[in-house]
UniProtKB/Swiss-Prot annotation:
This is 2-keto-3-deoxygluconate permease. Keywords: Cell inner membrane, Cell membrane, Membrane, Sugar transport, Symport, Transmembrane, Transmembrane helix, Transport. The chain crosses the membrane at residues 10-30, 42-62, 76-96, 105-125, 139-159, 163-183, 199-219, 224-244, 263-283, 289-309. Coiled coil: none annotated. It catalyses: 2-dehydro-3-deoxy-D-gluconate(in) + H(+)(in) = 2-dehydro-3-deoxy-D-gluconate(out) + H(+)(out). Belongs to the KdgT transporter family. One of its GO terms (cellular component) is plasma membrane. Its main location: membrane. It comes from Pectobacterium carotovorum subsp. carotovorum (Erwinia carotovora subsp. carotovora). One of its GO terms (molecular function) is 2-keto-3-deoxygluconate:proton symporter activity. HAMAP family: KdgT. It is found in: Cell inner membrane.
């Protein structure tokens, strides 16, 4: 059976299919983990430890070697994406209630959902698009984008906007596995290869555990809001990214469009933030479902928009 091949045809499938399977388990057999115990319970409830290993391996996979063009391009895109999410947090924090929108078609939208969906770029999608529609240097910009992985940037944004307060040690704890992996991977290429190969392998495991924190009814309730969030990510982050790429990064805007997506890893952010700041616990489940939908929407639409933009503004693709 070509199971992996079928999963790869679904945008973000490696993350979203196990996530959905986990949500199925949690909806119809919510006590399965405690009932089975042992290793099965670890797989079902082990989101945080599995993600900790994943962040370590992600750090180890990054090679600290880049040209000036790569650093300028990636730096511009990363800073612009984070700054945009921060502005959105400031505005949303002023107008949205702490527990998010509770009624109507946009029920579930919260500051946590908005920031988690917007502050992290799908680096793999970006690299693939820029390999096709840009240069090797532009494609290589995804290296710095990997630094967005994990809850750290979301913590910084929520803290800087005055929406949440985190103890200093929590920032250290959030980034330490990544930094240790990064250091080891750059000290020894063999370790980088060893741990880097595990990044993709671990995604279905933490996605399944994450899915076991979601009830399918929440996914159904937030369907339209999730689609709306995905479109919002493309428009709200895409416009500043295009302008930054053109006027600061020296590009034609294609890289900006390619970076206007939600990262698959962002699906785990609401739960991680709620684990550190309990005031977000009431909105974490809905935010997770919304961000998951946003990942699908942006994974489908961003390649199409990038191709159209490159055809219009890039001479070699005209």
């Amino acid at each position: 059976m070509k199971i992996k091949q079928a999963i790869d045809k679904i945008p973000g499938g490696l993350m979203l299919v196990p996530l959905f399977l986990g949500a199925l388990c949690n909806t119809f057999t919510p006590g399965a983990g405690k009932y089975l115990g042992s290793f099965s319970n670890g797989l079902i409830t082990g989101t945080i430890p599995i993600l900790a290993v994943w962040f370590f391996c992600m750090g180890a996979s990054i090679e600290f070697k880049a040209t000036g063009t790569m650093l300028r391009k990636s730096g511009v895109l990363v800073v612009t994406k984070i700054a945009t999410a921060w502005v959105v947090a400031l505005i949303a924090g002023t107008f949205l209630p702490g527990d998010g929108i509770q009624n109507g078609m946009l029920a579930g939208i919260s500051v946590l959902a908005l920031v988690a969906a917007m502050d992290m770029t799908n680096g793999g999608l970006y690299a693939a698009l820029m390999n096709q529609y840009g240069s090797k240097e532009e494609a290589g910009a995804f290296v710095l984008m990997s630094l967005e992985s994990g809850p750290l940037m979301t913590m910084v944004i929520l803290g800087a906007s005055g929406i949440a307060t985190f103890e200093p040690q929590l920032f250290v704890g959030a980034v330490l596995p990544f930094l240790i992996g990064f250091a080891l991977g750059n000290l020894d290429p063999d370790l980088r290869k060893l741990f880097g190969n595990s990044v993709q392998t671990l995604i279905p495991f933490f996605a399944f555990a994450l899915g076991n924190t979601i009830n399918l009814s929440v996914i159904l309730q937030t369907g339209f809001a999730g689609i709306f969030l995905g479109l919002l990510v493309i428009v709200v982050t895409g416009i500043p990214l295009i302008l930054a790429d053109k006027f600061i990064g020296g590009g034609n805007g294609t890289a900006g469009v390619a970076a206007s997506s939600s990262a698959g890893a962002a699906v785990a952010t609401p739960l991680l933030i709620a684990n550190m700041a309990p005031e977000f616990a009431p909105v974490a489940q809905q935010a997770t479902a919304l961000v998951a939908t946003s990942v699908i929407v942006t994974s489908v639409l961003v390649p199409i928009i990038t191709a159209l933009w490159a055809k219009r503004f890039s001479p070699k693709h005209a």
